[in-house]
Amino acid sequence: MSKKITKNRQKINELIKDVENKIYSLDEAIEMAKKTSFVKFDASIDISLKLNLDTRKADQQLRGSVSLPNGTGKIIRVLATSDEKEQLDLAKKAGANIVANKSDLEEILKSEKFDFDIMVTDPKMMPTLGKYGKVLGPKGLMPNPKTGTVTPNIAKAVEEIKKGKANYRADKGGIINSSIGKVSMGTTSLVENAKVLIDTIRKLKPATVKGIYMQNLTISTTMGPSFKIKIEN
């Protein structure tokens, strides 16, 4: 272990003394997460939110996306697909990295060389995409109406994605993990992003949920410690 890594670890240990017993405000937690990130890349700032959900019930399966006011700090490559040339032209102007008609799309999917992070499609293309669900699904590339990636207005969807969106999905345990930005972003911008995501999820509380809805909320960076945040239900 290098001296630099050891020194960084010592700094982290000093900063996170008794962290398990502390509850932070949102801005304090983000500041702490940034201070304890010593990886060599621009780490993500992530939110983990434990919700009182029974995801076996259809109305308690939360999934969607929300536009963040200050973006995510990530460069997202978007593929837009439609069989309408006008739609593709508008999507290209909106910032799509790749545009594909049905023939182009089938060629891309058959090659399994996916040089994109998100796919946006108009609903008419879903029968074609459905054939490749077993390939796209596990990679998280299958478009979904709940995340706004299946839409008649693909240009608008591309524009929103390029500006920055946070996707959220409750797992079987009712936990949502989502990124709100990068360590290099200002704390104020990250706080604003976090508030938008948290408020969105708060408003989606299913009517059938009994008791405390938001049970635990933490902020962390990639490979960094977690900091617990005071929740206002």
From Swiss-Prot:
InterPro entries: Ribosom_uL1_bac-type (IPR005878), Ribosomal_uL1 (IPR002143), Ribosomal_uL1-like (IPR023674), Ribosomal_uL1/biogenesis (IPR028364), Ribosomal_uL1_3-a/b-sand (IPR016095), Ribosomal_uL1_CS (IPR023673). Gene3D superfamilies: 3.30.190.20, 3.40.50.790. SUPFAM superfamilies: Ribosomal protein L1 (SSF56808). It holds the Pfam family Ribosomal_L1. GO terms for molecular function: rRNA binding; structural constituent of ribosome; tRNA binding. Keywords: Repressor, Ribonucleoprotein, Ribosomal protein, RNA-binding, rRNA-binding, Translation regulation, tRNA-binding. GO terms for biological process: regulation of translation; translation. One of its GO terms (cellular component) is large ribosomal subunit. PROSITE patterns: RIBOSOMAL_L1. The keyword RNA-binding applies. NCBIfam families: rplA_bact (TIGR01169). HAMAP family: Ribosomal_uL1_B. Binds directly to 23S rRNA. The L1 stalk is quite mobile in the ribosome, and is involved in E site tRNA release. Belongs to the universal ribosomal protein uL1 family. PANTHER family: 54S RIBOSOMAL PROTEIN L1, MITOCHONDRIAL, LARGE RIBOSOMAL SUBUNIT PROTEIN UL1M. Part of the 50S ribosomal subunit. This is Large ribosomal subunit protein uL1. It comes from Mycoplasma mobile (strain ATCC 43663 / 163K / NCTC 11711). The lineage of its organism: Bacteria, Bacillati, Mycoplasmatota, Mycoplasmoidales, Metamycoplasmataceae.
